[in-house]
Curated annotation (Swiss-Prot):
<keyword id="KW-0496">Mitochondrion</keyword>
<dbReference type="GO" id="GO:0051287">
    <property type="term" value="F:NAD binding"/>
</dbReference>
<dbReference type="InterPro" id="IPR004434">
    <property type="entry name" value="Isocitrate_DH_NAD"/>
</dbReference>
<feature type="binding site">
    <location>
        <position position="245"/>
    </location>
    <ligand>
        <name>Mg(2+)</name>
    </ligand>
</feature>
<comment type="similarity">
    <text>Belongs to the isocitrate and isopropylmalate dehydrogenases family.</text>
</comment>
<comment type="subunit">
    <text>Heterooligomer of catalytic and regulatory subunits.</text>
</comment>
<dbReference type="GO" id="GO:0000287">
    <property type="term" value="F:magnesium ion binding"/>
</dbReference>
<feature type="binding site">
    <location>
        <position position="269"/>
    </location>
    <ligand>
        <name>Mg(2+)</name>
    </ligand>
</feature>
<dbReference type="GO" id="GO:0004449">
    <property type="term" value="F:isocitrate dehydrogenase (NAD+) activity"/>
</dbReference>
<comment type="function">
    <text>Catalytic subunit of the NAD(+)-dependent isocitrate dehydrogenase involved in the oxidative decarboxylation of isocitrate to 2-oxoglutarate. Performs an essential role in the oxidative function of the citric acid cycle.</text>
</comment>
<feature type="transit peptide" description="Mitochondrion">
    <location>
        <begin position="1"/>
        <end position="44"/>
    </location>
</feature>
<dbReference type="GO" id="GO:0005829">
    <property type="term" value="C:cytosol"/>
</dbReference>
<keyword id="KW-0560">Oxidoreductase</keyword>
<protein>
    <recommendedName>
        <fullName>Isocitrate dehydrogenase [NAD] catalytic subunit 6, mitochondrial</fullName>
        <ecNumber>1.1.1.41</ecNumber>
    </recommendedName>
</protein>
<feature type="binding site">
    <location>
        <position position="158"/>
    </location>
    <ligand>
        <name>substrate</name>
    </ligand>
</feature>
<feature type="binding site">
    <location>
        <position position="273"/>
    </location>
    <ligand>
        <name>Mg(2+)</name>
    </ligand>
</feature>
<keyword id="KW-0460">Magnesium</keyword>
Length: 374
């Protein structure tokens, strides 16, 4: 595979069908949104959660890079509340949610849920209230940035609304607690359909359903049954079922064994971070949450890093690449490709890298270098 083709496959989307990126040289997984703009000169209204810790700094990097790339965007900045909103049972407010529902698209920096009882986590609230049913995380090697593996190119698709993360825990008796795992046919069919349609749309050859049905025969058994049913509709795509522990071993031994992985919530949380480690960490990994009614929320999945907050040391790559995914979703393919190439070239050159990438550049210098490549 040539370097041009190698990079093209990693560009996050390139088409304009119901799921973006229908050409063979793209990998854009996101459901299209019907919006009232058709050119790069029409302002886009998008929700922005700068987030906590380093969030505001890396959000500022995104703003600067988007401006340099002539992305005309009107950010609706949202900040979580200082008290629990009774309508959401979270520090995430009702107005925060309404912003995303209205704009249909958004970008989220890292959020830190305040410690304490009696309220839901911020991320869980977003997923539940906005029905963000699929988390799509491309995991690919960045040319010029050396890691333990070369040419990693896979996609994790995580069911995002149920499983062990249903919030159903209680104490049975003193010293004994119980947590309920919820798997439904509706949610499993929905994410399975998305995974196979994604694979077909983007020229992917294989879908792996990750499970532990050998032990959890009812819950994971239902998930697998749904994947089996959907797989039967796509005979051109190779389908396999892989036990979660074996999947972890296979990923570490040879990531090239996988293409598209679809899995329940908890497994997706774990496997997607494992895959990020194959290519350099969460600081290099973009992510997009897909919801019904055309909602898409891109996010940086790393932590808020309060220890370096305000020190101009943060790496904005993950949020920038997630922003690229958002632009692809909005069919702003030209600007998305320009920004993606500028990020890749900056990292590959090696002159300007933040400390986590082995360099000594500040957030400001790294961002400026990306803008200069534009």
């Amino acid at each position: 595979m040539t370097m041009t083709a190698f990079l093209a496959r990693r560009l996050i989307g390139n088409g304009s069908s119901q799921i973006l990126g229908t050409s063979s040289s793209s990998s854009g997984p996101f459901i299209s949104v019907s919006r009232a703009f058709f050119s790069s000169s029409t302002p886009i209204k998008a929700t922005l959660f700068p987030g906590d810790g380093i969030g505001p700094e890396i959000a500022e990097s995104v703003k600067q890079v988007f401006t340099a790339a002539d992305v005309v965007i009107d950010w609706d900045e949202q900040f979580v509340g200082t008290e629990v909103d009774p309508r959401t049972n979270s520090f995430l407010t009702w107005d925060n949610l309404q912003s995303v529902l209205k704009n249909k698209v958004g970008l989220k920096g890292p959020m830190a849920t305040p410690i304490g009882k009696g309220h839901r986590s911020l991320n869980l609230t977003l997923r539940k209230e906005l029905n963000l049913y699929a988390n799509v995380r491309p995991c690919y090697s960045l040319p010029g940035y050396k890691t333990r593996y070369d040419d990693v190119d896979l996609i994790t698709i995580r069911e995002n609304t149920e499983g062990e993360y249903s919030g159903l825990e209680h104490q049975v008796v003193k010293g004994v607690v119980e947590s309920l795992k919820i798997i439904t046919r509706k949610a499993s069919m929905r994410v399975a359909e998305y995974a196979f349609l994604y694979a077909k749309t983007h020229g992917r050859k294989k879908v792996s359903a990750i499970h532990k049905a050998n032990i959890m025969q009812k819950t994971d058994g239902l998930f697998l049954q749904c994947c089996d049913e959907v797989a039967a509709k796509y005979p051109e795509i190779y389908y396999e079922k892989v036990v979660i522990d074996n999947c972890c071993m296979m990923l570490v031994k040879n990531p090239a064994l996988f293409d598209v992985l679809v899995m329940p919530n908890l497994y997706g949380d774990i496997i997607s971070d494992l895959c990020a480690g194959l290519v350099g960490g969460l600081g290099l990994t973009p992510s997009m949450n897909i919801g019904e009614d055309g909602i898409a929320l891109a996010e940086a999945v790393h932590g808020s890093a309060p220890d370096i907050a305000g020190m101009n040391l943060a790496n904005p790559t993950a949020l920038l690449l997630s922003g690229v995914m958002m632009l692809r979703h909005l069919k702003l393919n030209k600007q998305a490709e320009q920004i993606h190439s500028a990020i890749i070239n900056t990292i590959a050159e090696g002159k300007y890298r933040t400390a986590d990438l082995g360099g000594s550049s500040t957030t400001t210098d790294f961002t400026k270098a990306i803008c200069d490549h534009l």
